[in-house]
Amino acid sequence: MDYQDTLTYLYNSVPMFQQVGGSAYKEGLENTLTQDAHFEHPHRSFRSIHVAGTNGKGSCSHTLAAILQEAGYRVGLYTSPHLVDFRERIRINGQPIPEEYVIRFVAQERGFFEPLHPSFFELTTAMAFRYFADEKVDVAVIEVGLGGRLDCTNIIRPDVCIITNISFDHTQFLGDTLAKIAGEKAGIIKSGIPVVIGETTPETKPVFLEKAQTTGAPIYFAEENDREDYPGIEYELKGLYQQKNARTILTALPLLKEAGYRLDGQAVRSGFARVVELTGLMGRWQKLQDSPTLICDTGHNVGGITYITEQLKQQAYRQLHIIIGMVNDKDIRGVLALLPREATYYFTKASVKRALPESELQELAEAAGLEGHCYPDVPAAVRAAQEKSLPEDFIFVGGSSFIVADLLANRDALNLY
């Protein structure tokens, strides 16, 4: 099999949450532990940092990886989902896992995986851990896939755990209250390992405190951190929510130093200032066009869209155009209620099975007072917005990671940079 054949095999032979949603979710660590034993516990050969949370965990993971790279470490980075290429999920010092490694791993191990029937995420986690061990990384930044307690990344014993925040998402698996969701994400907290909590609410803070107390884990709240260890940092990531992510990271850095990491001010500043270049991060308030400005962002739940709408209010423009699509298992009405009514809307759908049909989204949006037209795919919606926009207008593309993925996959055809 070549690389495309291998991806087709992966996408079709194991259930992929990105495509089918809940039916791909496998609760429990039985498969993970079986895989870990088969591959001889590769995660034990490298140090790690574990990052969970409803929103912001991808940005935090990439920024931490960038800082560690600039400090001279060989850094593995495991995140999800990917936007354009599967290999984005697994990187070392910003470079995606080689196609040849993916091909070889699947060819050699399919006989092991097929009787096990792992999920797509279980299989890719095994691939990532094996790759990081084979390539002898010094440290890996590991982003939780979903939740925490039963996530298949939760076999690692990291130097530091981070939980960015708690909002409503994946409630069918994690619970229908913030406290229940916090309880699942607090499952990554382990005995004696310091944990940083990025944001809390009155419902979630007691959950974290109790878990830290019962496990004997030192706990630190970024909201209470007023230290200025690195004054004058320039942040490449411009989303409003990145300010909270930065405080979370800055709270974690002293704990990493205590764990023996060498992190000087230059590495920290360079990591924050060059995270996109160093790690390949995409889709976070990413600018793709001037005159009119076109911005995309992967925020896709009430928590993420809240920050996006606040940032849209700060932009200067003649007319706002919003290209939006969502998947069918999100709080669609909750998101639509947050969006500005004065914008012109372009309702579309992503090229995944979970995508909500654009006509259904338009119907729900009209009930929320949002006016616009339907387009069959993201490129068609973007072209329509480009044609209707004047240079002083502002185009926003989002509502789902998969909408952003389709946008980025077609950026050349759409004359975007």
Locate predicted features.
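Residue-level signal for inorganic ion chemistry
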Residues: T54, V75, V141, T164, ...
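C-terminal helical cap/extension that packs against the catalytic core
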Residues: T200-Y220, T293-L294, V302, V335-F394
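Glycine/aspartate-rich loop-and-adjacent alpha/beta segment that forms the canonical ThDP
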Residues: S400-Y417
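Short functional linear segments
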Residues: M1-G53, C60, A66, E70-A71
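Extended acidic/charged loop-beta regions that coordinate divalent cations
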Residues: P81, T124-F173, K205-E234
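Nucleotide phosphate-binding/pyrophosphate-handling subdomain across enzymes
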Residues: V139-V144, C152-I162, S167-H170, Y230-T344
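ATP-dependent carboxylate-amine ligase catalytic core
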Residues: G22-L29, T34-R44, E70-I156
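Internal gly/pro-rich beta-alpha loop/helix module
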Residues: V160, F173-K180, K185-I188, I193-P254
